[in-house]
Design a protein with these regions (language model features):
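Short, functionally important structural connectors and interaction interfaces within domains
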Residues: 6-9, 67, 81-82
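Short conserved micro-motifs at the rims of enzyme active sites and ligand-binding pockets
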Residues: 26-28, 57-60, 93-98
């Protein structure tokens, strides 16, 4: 209704989930913590969107996650279709474990610690950058007083 980023007033969705989204004037940007429906453990990510998504009137839905404040978030249909506003959701081991479980059979499978892996990669990048810069000069510039 507010014609955010387009002159289009309405547009049909794919029809995969019993949800409808209404665009809002204000963009939501926030860090969130959540629990995954049907899984153990908590996760975190961030939201960045202009919409409010609610179930289509008369339809039932299953929330995909529940935010830390108890608010249901996202939607899941069966085991093959999920919708969520949470960016970075696949960085959470509990989500990866949940996604892989139906295909792992009876094998005990657990995902690697992706956050630790990312931290390790950032440290490698920082070491590489430091090795090619005059760090004493940079620190001198940063601590110089006018």
């Amino acid at each position: 209704p507010h014609r955010i980023e387009s002159d289009t007033e309405t547009m049909p969705g794919l029809g995969l989930l019993p949800m409808q989204t209404v665009m809002q004037k204000e963009k939501v940007t926030r860090q969130v913590r959540f629990t995954l429906a049907g899984a153990t453990g908590a996760g975190q990510g961030y939201e960045i969107h202009n919409g409010t998504t609610l179930p289509v009137e008369g339809e039932t839905y299953t929330p995909f996650t529940r935010l830390e404040d108890g608010t249901p978030e996202g939607s899941i249909s069966g085991s093959r279709c999920v919708g969520t506003y949470i960016h970075g959701i696949l960085d959470n081991p509990s989500v990866i474990d949940w996604l892989v479980a139906p295909y792992a059979g009876k094998k005990a499978v657990s995902s690697p610690d992706y956050a630790a892996y990312k931290e390790e990669q950032y440290n490698k990048l920082a070491d590489h950058v430091r090795s090619h810069l005059n760090m004493p000069l940079i620190y001198q510039i940063l601590t110089a007083h006018d």
